[in-house]
Amino acid sequence: KKVRFHIGCLFIRKQLLEENNLFFDEDLRLGEDLDFIYRLLITCDMYAVPYYMYKHNYRENSLMNSCRTITHYRHESFAHERIYSSVMQLYKGNRKEEIHTLLSQNRAYHKTRYLWNVLLNGDFKLLNQLVESNDKELRDCNLPGKRDKRRAKILASKNYILWRMVRLVNRKKNKR
């Protein structure tokens, strides 16, 4: 059974963190919790209690509800690069290929999302540079969703006219 959880759901002994040198990576602006959780999962056994033991308070002016900027997507993409590297380096189990596939898809998804937002922002010069440096990954990416595959193909096409048309259509769609 799949279980969704986040850092606020974990009870962790301080001794475990110190013995295994598990701390948040302060260089990551986003995704530091994911990086920490993945390293924690690799390092030790975990047990789940299938009950809600907390109450989530929704605050209207919370940062979690704020609009995402292009910088947010860039940091998120960078964080997933780092997570992929650290997990693949630390993991010693027998499911390395499966984990590689999942993390590669996740990394490609976040990178494609960042590039797509650069396209929608209209910074075609930056987009062209980023697509050039990620060309192979965009062409080979195995994203699960049709929309994400289509976006990766559009980005990998390096077709300036197509990029401008996509931006124009999306701007009109967002004005409705």
Annotate each predicted stretch with a short phrase.
Residues 1-70:
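Conserved nucleotide-sugar donor-binding catalytic segment
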Residues 6, 74-78, 105:
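Alpha-helix N-cap/helix-start motif at coil-to-helix transitions, marked by capping-box chemistry
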Residues 52-60, 66-95, 113-138:
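Catalytic core of nucleotide-sugar-dependent glycosyltransferases
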Residues 92-102, 139-146:
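Short, surface-exposed acidic
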